[in-house]
């Protein structure tokens, strides 16, 4: 949103930290991604054997990439509740990434009021999974200077026009699940 501000745009986006963790390596035992939707928790095992897991945002705006201890504890508790053997593993490292969150949990894939300036952001937790389809519709938007029919609802003016998307439980409002 700092770059957008330089262009004169005010974006309805908050920046939150999402932490991830990795344990010491163990023999292969988790062959799929394990997720717990109610806790926004996920876990998988890396090729080197470490358990990679994370979940939940810290709950306040920040650009820092270091996590807070209460969230570390909460996410570790989720890991142990699902897979009790995790309590025996040592945590090797953790890191945080910045999530750009919109109030309704849906991204922006659109033109702006500034000529030749387009915006694709506010993906909350879902950006990586949605990249192929959103990239295709965003390319169409840029090439034709008009939104593709599949991304028309992801406009910057949807809040001003009262057209929020009913995507609760994904963005900042995780308690609505």
Model-derived regions, located:
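Central helical "cap/lid" subdomain
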Residues: 1-31
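Alpha-helical scaffold segments in soluble metabolic enzymes
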Residues: 2, 6, 78, 137
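Active-site lid/adjacent beta-loop-alpha segment flanking the redox-cofactor pocket in flavoenzymes
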Residues: 10, 25-116
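Hydrophobic alpha-helical segments typical of transmembrane helices
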Residues: 16-17, 75, 105, 150
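C-terminal catalytic lobe of FAD-dependent flavoproteins
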Residues: 37-38, 80-177
